[in-house]
């Protein structure tokens, strides 16, 4: 890295600090000592590790504490748990870009925005070739909650030394419909996050084995795609032109699709180096599920704000639907048979998400009729940004 690049990264780090300072204090503000105490005294974490299978080592909790203690925190409002998540994701993306010969320009300052809003963002840093890439604390929590709800909803069946997952929408919906805990999970996923206090009001749940293994794959897929999407904006210099002008960007929609396609391509490049590629990621199923669920949080919030449209009974938001359909036309050199299978997987998962929200929508309308208002939430925000 040249002296110029090093100086630009320092400017980007300071710019990220200024972005963090825009947010008021919230219940997610924690010091490193607070987080370490939480890890040491949390039996739920030991229970979680036990769900990862016979090969899961009890030492993982001790290793987590050591890693958290060693995690550098560039800015005053960084906290080690979420910052380390984003740090590892960004390191993975940057390493893949270097191997693939994708220029990272002046570099990226990354971290977590201290808010329960659902945001994944890239900010161009003026006068430099750098960007700030951030996931919000709320977004990280939402991905975790979504991975639990979806993994637990998919029927799992042992097949020798492996697991068979039944992703057929009818079977997934049957499982959800027959389990009150699963129904509550999905109700909270859209409702609590739309209301604005998802991370505060959603109880910490431990997904049992073997669903926990699927949950980890889904969580990884949601987070890695989101970060890769923001890096795509940085690589393509999206934001640099807008910062010099006024008004909206007429090419915003096409830029989002471009970023989605870059992200899925880079994620496939990363996964092809592993022995067992993450099927939820390489198929594009997890990315489209994430896009749809963010859209449904937006729709649920509209209900709580009294701005619901009775016609919106499925995910027909033009931008979201256009982005979801773009995955069908981007085969990225994948063999035709595999591309068809990937498309079927995406469509099956989309059908599940559409059906779940359609069934929950009347309940959210009833909540509004009973007096629930989004303005009543002390941490209300406009959720659902992945752009």
Language-model features, listed with the residues they occupy:
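Long, well-structured alpha-helical subdomains associated
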Residues: 1-35, 40, 268-387
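Peri-catalytic and regulatory segments of divalent metal-dependent proteins
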Residues: 31-224, 236-239
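A structural signal for well-ordered alpha-helical segments within the folded catalytic domains
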Residues: 87, 221-222, 229, 257, ...
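Divalent metal-coordination and catalytic microenvironments
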Residues: 135, 259, 319
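Alpha-helical scaffolds flanking conserved acidic
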Residues: 213-225, 253, 277-285
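Short active-site segment of divalent metal-dependent hydrolases/proteases
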Residues: 228, 232-236
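Post-HEXXH active-site segment of zinc metalloproteases
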Residues: 236-261
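Solvent-exposed alpha-helix faces
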Residues: 264-265
């Amino acid at each position: 890295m040249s002296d110029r690049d090093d100086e630009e990264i320092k400017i980007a780090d300071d710019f990220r600090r200024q972005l963090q300072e825009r947010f008021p204090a919230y219940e997610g503000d924690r010091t490193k000592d607070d987080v370490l105490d939480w890890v040491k005294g949390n039996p739920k974490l030991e229970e979680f590790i036990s769900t990862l299978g016979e090969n899961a080592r009890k030492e993982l909790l001790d290793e987590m504490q050591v890693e958290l203690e060693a995690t550098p925190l560039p800015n005053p409002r960084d906290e080690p748990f979420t910052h380390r998540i984003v740090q590892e994701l960004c390191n993975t993306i940057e390493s893949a870009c270097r191997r693939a010969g994708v220029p990272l320009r002046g570099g990226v300052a990354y971290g977590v925005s201290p808010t329960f809003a659902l945001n994944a963002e890239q900010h161009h840093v003026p006068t430099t070739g750098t960007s700030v890439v951030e996931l919000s604390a709320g977004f990280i929590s939402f991905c975790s909650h979504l991975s639990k709800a979806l993994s637990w909803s998919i029927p799992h069946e042992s097949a020798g030394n492996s697991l068979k997952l039944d992703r057929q929408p009818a079977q997934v919906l049957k499982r959800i419909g027959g389990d009150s805990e699963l129904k509550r999970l999905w109700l909270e996923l859209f409702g609590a996050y739309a209301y604005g206090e998802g991370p505060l009001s959603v109880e910490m749940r431990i997904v049992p084995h073997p669903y926990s293994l699927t949950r980890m794959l889904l969580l990884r897929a949601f987070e890695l795609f989101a970060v890769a999407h923001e890096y795509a904006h940085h690589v393509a210099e999206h934001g640099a032109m807008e910062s010099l002008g006024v008004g909206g960007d007429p090419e915003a929609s096409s830029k989002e699709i471009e970023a989605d396609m870059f992200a899925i391509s880079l994620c496939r490049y990363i996964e092809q180096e592993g022995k067992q590629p993450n099927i939820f990621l390489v198929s594009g199923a997890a990315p489209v599920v994430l896009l749809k669920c963010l859209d449904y949080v937006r729709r649920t919030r509209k209900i709580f704000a009294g701005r619901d449209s009775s016609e919106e009974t499925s995910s027909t938001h033009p931008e979201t639907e256009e982005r979801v359909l773009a995955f069908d036309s981007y085969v990225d050199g994948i063999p035709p048979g595999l591309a068809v299978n990937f498309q079927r997987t995406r469509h099956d998962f989309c059908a599940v998400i559409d059906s779940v929200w359609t069934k929950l929508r009347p309940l959210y309308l009833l909540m509004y009729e009973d007096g629930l208002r989004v303005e009543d939430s002390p941490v209300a925000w406009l959720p659902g940004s992945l752009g």
